[in-house]
């Protein structure tokens, strides 16, 4: 008897050669008949700066997959795996909501197919072997103060940010990152296939020896062990929506402290199987979309066909910071920040209004739509949360029209990977955040001199709640600079991570975490 996921594969006519079942509702896709399909359309979902509960990008993306399929278009989703950090922290589950969610909901939000655990184990094995070399005073002569990779864990645990311990009587300072912000997670999501991952992994610098020579994974003779751990994890996971439409869920870096996009492997699989692929990137366009375009799309040498900007009255009110009647006009300034950013890429775009039928008044929705019309911005309402694919005629029609319109403009990125680091910083701060440049701490100034000429992508870690680096500066702040505290290097994925004020790659739990009296919903 066919499993549920096999029934969907057959019903949708997905040209899959080989897959491995994980229970009744999950399949690891191992090979596809036509991997080089050229005519698929890529739609990426982003948002304004969200309120703390989130903006509904994943729900909107899932709802759009269902809407397109309902109206006769072969659409597939390509989304990130939820991390148990936010699932048990502030945000809660991360696989959609209402009538637009993924199945199996409980498994996806917890252990899923074990990808996160595999990445955690592989990452921590690297650190353990490095420290074992130091403990045994091996000929590699690794400097205990120059270990570049930290341990990781898929739990929010602020006590592990900074730790001190002995390695054979050598005092060492280190810490943990959350798995979603680990170096291996970034490489996992930016690798094009198993071979590409293995090649980049082998050359990854993870430490330096006492005469400042780099120590790579291949020097540690660890490449084969890491590949053995991650062999199955690197295959993309296929699941389904509540309305039985296909979605790949694979990889899960955060966008505020990592690059915030699902795996390239899953995206390539989706493009090979569907005519329309709906993907998303974390938080607002200032974080997720900027990295999606300047890191993921640059790496793939690919231009998306449509950008969908999700906005909501709840987030507009959050940025307006008022209950006055004209809050929509005040909070709309944040929407315009993101539209100005999106326009820089030469990609068609649309605004999706994420409607909450329980709280949003028709009067306020009409006010919002009037503002969008005044700025000549195409828009459509999304009722995905409340109705699933029902009431989806408008969003489907406008999405298909814009996705298929001729756009011969070349993709314009914010920076080139060969630009100097100082120039990359300047371009993002001014063109994405609207800042008056940036300021460096003493530590960051010293690091900038060392990293200035690295041909790496720039990944800025900052708050998601403001276009600036200060979570309290809501809406459309002016006359500010971005403050860079330090730089961290991810040699695996070729990322320079610029850490802004009070940002940690290991989050802490909020005062009343979702883990208390947890309900899977």
From Swiss-Prot:
Transmembrane intervals: none
Annotated SUPFAM superfamilies: P-loop containing nucleoside triphosphate hydrolases
Pathway involvement of the protein, from the record: One-carbon metabolism; tetrahydrofolate interconversion
Coiled coil residues, start to end: none
Keywords: ATP-binding, Ligase, Nucleotide-binding, One-carbon metabolism
Catalyzed reaction equations: (6S)-5,6,7,8-tetrahydrofolate + formate + ATP = (6R)-10-formyltetrahydrofolate + ADP + phosphate
Keyword ATP-binding: yes
A single GO BP: tetrahydrofolate interconversion
Enzyme Commission number(s): 6.3.4.3
Cross-referenced Pfam families: FTHFS
Statement: the UniProt record of this protein carries the keyword Manganese: no
Source species, domain of life: Bacteria
Descriptive protein name: Formate--tetrahydrofolate ligase
Organism of this sequence: Ureaplasma parvum serovar 3 (strain ATCC 700970)
């Amino acid at each position: 008897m066919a499993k549920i996921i096999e029934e969907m594969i057959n019903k949708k006519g997905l040209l899959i050669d080989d897959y491995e079942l994980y229970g009744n509702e999950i399949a690891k896709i191992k090979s596809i008949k036509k991997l080089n399909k050229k005519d698929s359309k890529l739609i990426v979902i982003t948002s304004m700066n969200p309120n703390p509960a989130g903006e509904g990008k994943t729900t909107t993306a899932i709802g759009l997959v269902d809407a397109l399929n309902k109206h006769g278009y072969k659409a597939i989703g390509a989304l990130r795996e939820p991390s148990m950090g936010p699932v048990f922290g502030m945000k809660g589950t991360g696989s959609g909501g209402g009538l637009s969610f993924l199945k199996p909901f409980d498994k996806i939000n917890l252990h899923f197919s074990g990808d996160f655990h595999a990445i955690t184990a592989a990452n921590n094995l690297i650190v353990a072997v490095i420290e074992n070399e130091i403990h045994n005073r091996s000929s590699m002569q690794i400097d205990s103060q120059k270990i570049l990779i930290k341990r990781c864990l898929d739990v929010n645990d602020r006590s592990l940010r900074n730790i001190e311990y002995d390695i054979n009587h050598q005092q060492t300072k280190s810490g943990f990152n959350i798995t979603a912000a680990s170096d291996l997670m970034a490489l996992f999501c930016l690798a094009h296939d198993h071979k590409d991952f293995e090649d980049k992994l082998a050359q990854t610098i993870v430490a330096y020896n006492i005469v400042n020579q780099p120590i790579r994974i291949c020097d540690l003779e660890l490449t084969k062990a890491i590949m053995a751990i991650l062999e199955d994890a690197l295959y993309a996971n296929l699941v389904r929506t509540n309305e039985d439409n296909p979605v790949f869920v694979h990889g899960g870096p955060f966008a505020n402290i990592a690059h915030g996009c699902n795996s390239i492997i899953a995206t390539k699989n989706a493009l090979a199987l569907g005519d329309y692929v709906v993907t998303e990137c974390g938080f607002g366009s200032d974080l997720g979309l900027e990295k999606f375009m300047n890191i993921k799309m640059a790496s793939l040498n690919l231009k998306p066909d449509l950008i969908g900007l999700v906005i909501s009255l709840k987030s507009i009110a959050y940025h307006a910071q008022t209950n006055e009647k004209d809050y929509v006009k005040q909070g709309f300034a944040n929407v315009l920040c993101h539209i100005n950013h999106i326009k820089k890429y030469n990609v068609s775009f649309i605004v999706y209004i994420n409607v909450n039928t329980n709280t949003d008044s028709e009067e306020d929705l009409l006010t919002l739509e009037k503002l969008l019309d005044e700025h000549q911005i195409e828009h459509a309402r999304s009722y995905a949360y409340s109705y699933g694919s029902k009431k989806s005629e408008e969003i489907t029609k406008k999405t298909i029209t814009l996705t298929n319109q001729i756009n011969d403009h070349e993709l314009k990125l914010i920076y080139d990977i060969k630009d100097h680091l100082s120039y990359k910083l300047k371009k993002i701060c001014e063109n994405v955040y609207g800042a008056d440049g940036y300021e460096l701490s003493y530590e960051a100034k010293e690091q900038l001199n060392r990293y200035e000429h690295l041909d790496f992508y720039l990944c800025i870690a900052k708050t998601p709640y403001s276009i600036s680096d200060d979570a309290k500066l809501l809406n459309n702040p002016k006359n500010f600079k971005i403050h860079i505290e330090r730089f961290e290097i991810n040699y695996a994925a070729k990322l320079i991570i610029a850490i802004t004020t009070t940002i940690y790659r290991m989050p802490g739990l909020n005062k009343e975490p979702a883990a208390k009296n947890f309900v899977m919903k």
